[in-house]
């Protein structure tokens, strides 16, 4: 297995060390002090398996497309239709930059976005009715992954995607709430192609900011 990416971090060095990864191409390192010392101490071994390129090359959409990269990016949250927020907590506090994730998500042979299904000891669901900030649209997201499962969204209608994301990716404690939201959206939304209840779609985020929990009090 080889890696064509933007930044090499500790996990990739461990994969190289184990032999599971044979080579890695990137534009920079972002290593912990401990891992940096380890790499410097064994540079003769790594220099044959790591190449650093200009960002114009490492993030070049045409090269990413021609290589057939399987693009795997982390996310903060995804909504039931496949829109992804990878940079902003609660829609306004930036956690990290966008980086090259857009180049890889849009141009990779397969675009995978992943996160745990919940955060903050279960008080936050990473699968929500509507994301509070959009970095990757539903048109670029092909596969969503959490520890609960995998949702292959390719070729599906919005309502098919929503049902699959809830079934495969949502945390068990949030799944009934998402199913209820979708059912009521299908019944009461303005139009039914991509059902939403606009008075509720960002309500989970508002509830967390008020109470410290996305779940209603009687559910938590």
Report residues per predicted region:
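Conserved phosphate- and dinucleotide-binding cores of soluble alpha/beta proteins
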Residues: 1-220
